[in-house]
Amino acid sequence: MLRLITAAVLVSACLAYPQKKRTPPQTRPTSRALVSQCRPCPTCRECKCRECKCRECQCRIHSCLSAWDSRGIWMRT
């Protein structure tokens, strides 16, 4: 019986103080030049720029965007 009361108190306390939602990390604003060079990721085809992380395949600059030069030309074959 005591366990039931304790569980009820804990549940009500959790409901009274809801958990904070995790906010995604802030990214720097992208410049127009970077946005104009935005190209699709070769793995998942989702368009992304140098400032962001691909949501689909989780790749970053070293695995995906390193293939694009500063003019936005595909360097890998």
Swiss-Prot record:
Disulfide cross-links: none
Propeptide residues per the UniProt entry: 17-32
Entry PTM: Contains 5 disulfide bonds.
Cytoplasm as UniProt keyword: no
Record's GO cellular component terms: extracellular region
GO molecular function, one term: toxin activity
UniProt entry tagged with the keyword Repeat: no
UniProt note on tissues of expression: Expressed by the venom duct.
Signal peptide extent: 1-16
Record keywords, A-Z: Disulfide bond, Secreted, Signal, Toxin
Family label: Belongs to the conotoxin B2 family.
Swiss-Prot/TrEMBL domain comment: The cysteine framework is VIII (C-C-C-C-C-C-C-C-C-C).
Miscellaneous comment text of the record: The gene superfamily associated with this precursor was described as 'B superfamily' in PubMed:23152539, but this name was already assigned to the conantokin precursors, therefore the superfamily was renamed 'B2 superfamily'.
Designated name of the protein: Conotoxin Mr8.2
Organism: Conus marmoreus
High-level lineage: Eukaryota, Metazoa, Spiralia, Lophotrochozoa, Mollusca
